[in-house]
C-alpha cells in the first residue's frame, strides 16, 4: 500500500469532517483496531528482520503524520465551537447596565435614628447598656419589690447563671436600668437617652417578645414636671412634624417614678382621628432610685420617660400590626425605602 496515499487520504478525510463525531469515525478508518495503519503494523511480523525494521520506521512516520493531522482538526473544531459559544454569550458593552436595588433602613431603625437626632439637638447624650442585665439593676435598683409581678417568669425571660456578685441574670424588660448605671458613672446635670432592645413574655398584634424602647433621663437640682412636659411635647412636635399636637399627662403608677403619668397624644386625622393614644410612660424619678444612683435625693431631682420605638413608628406611619415589622416581608418594608 502506498504510505503517502494513506497520509493524503487521512488529511483529506479529517479536513472534510464537519463535527467531532464524523472526525472520530474517520480516525477509526486509519488508526482504529482495523484501520489501515494498524493492519500494516500487524503485517510486519511476516517480514524478515531487515525489511521489518525499515518498513516499521516508515509506517511509524506515517502514523505520526496522520495523528498530527487528526490533532490539528480536533483543535480547529474546538475553536469553532468556542467561537460560536462566545458569539452566543457575547455582552454588548454599549447596553445600559442592570440596576441594583439600594438597601434602606428598617422603619423602626429610621425611628431610632430620628429620636436620637431630635434629642441630641436639645442637649441629651445617647448611651447604650447591656441587654443581659441583673435582676438588681432591672428591678431592685428601680424600686421594684421582691414580690412585684413583673419579676415572674410569666413576664420576664430569665437567663441561666449569675454575675460575679451572684445576682440573677435576665433579658432586660426595659432600658430603665441604664438610669442607675449611667448616673453612677456620670455627675449631674445628667441628660441622656438610652435606645435599645428589650424583652418581655408577650406576643400579639401590639406586643412582641422583643421590642425597642428609648429611655430618657434628666437629673439636676431644679428639674420639675413642667420640664418633662416641655421636653416631651417639643419632641413629639418634631417627631411628627406638626405644631398643633395636643398632649395630656394622665396619672398612673410606676415603681421608679413618683408622681407618674402616662403621656397621651390626640390624633385629629387618619384612622385614629379623635382618639387619645398612649405614647409613653413618664414621671419624676423616685427618691429611692435617686439614692441607688449614688446621689442625694434631697438635693437632686429629675424626670424619666420610656417610649416604645415600634409604637412611635406605628403611629407615624399608620401601621396597625406590630408583627409586620418582624416578618421580613419586602412588600411591606419597601414602602419605607
Curated annotation (Swiss-Prot):
GO MF, one example: magnesium ion binding
Note the superkingdom of the native organism.
Bacteria
CDD domains recorded:
PheRS_alpha_core (cd00496)
Q: Which GO terms describe its biological process?
A: phenylalanyl-tRNA aminoacylation
Primary location class? cytoplasm
Amino-acid positions noted as binding Mg(2+) in the UniProt annotation, renumbered to this chain? 258
Under the cellular component aspect of Gene Ontology, which terms does the record hold? cytoplasm
Mind telling me which Gene3D superfamilies this protein's record contains?
Answer: Bira Bifunctional Protein, Domain 2
Pfam families for this protein: Phe_tRNA-synt_N, tRNA-synt_2d
- Look up the record and name the cofactor or cofactors this protein needs: Mg(2+)
Which reaction is this enzyme known to catalyze? tRNA(Phe) + L-phenylalanine + ATP = L-phenylalanyl-tRNA(Phe) + AMP + diphosphate + H(+)
* Keywords, ordered alphabetically: Aminoacyl-tRNA synthetase, ATP-binding, Cytoplasm, Ligase, Magnesium, Metal-binding, Nucleotide-binding, Protein biosynthesis
Question: Key word Aminoacyl-tRNA synthetase present in the record?
Answer: yes
Q: Subcellular location, in the record's words?
A: Cytoplasm
Q: For this UniProt entry, which segments traverse the membrane?
A: none
EC number of this enzyme: 6.1.1.20
Cofactor, how bound (note): Binds 2 magnesium ions per tetramer.
Which InterPro entries does this entry report, sorted A to Z?
Answer: aa-tRNA-synth_II, aa-tRNA-synth_II/BPL/LPL, Phe-tRNA-synth_IIc_asu, Phe-tRNA_ligase_II_N, Phe_tRNA_ligase_alpha1_bac, Phenylalanyl-tRNA_Synthase, tRNA-bd_arm
tRNA-binding listed as a keyword: no
**SUPFAM superfamilies xrefs:** Class II aaRS and biotin synthetases, tRNA-binding arm
Q: Which family does it belong to?
A: Belongs to the class-II aminoacyl-tRNA synthetase family. Phe-tRNA synthetase alpha subunit type 1 subfamily.
Q: How the protein assembles, per its UniProt entry?
A: Tetramer of two alpha and two beta subunits.
Protein name, as recorded: Phenylalanine--tRNA ligase alpha subunit
What broad taxonomic lineage does this protein's source fall under? Bacteria, Pseudomonadati, Pseudomonadota, Betaproteobacteria, Burkholderiales
The gene is pheS
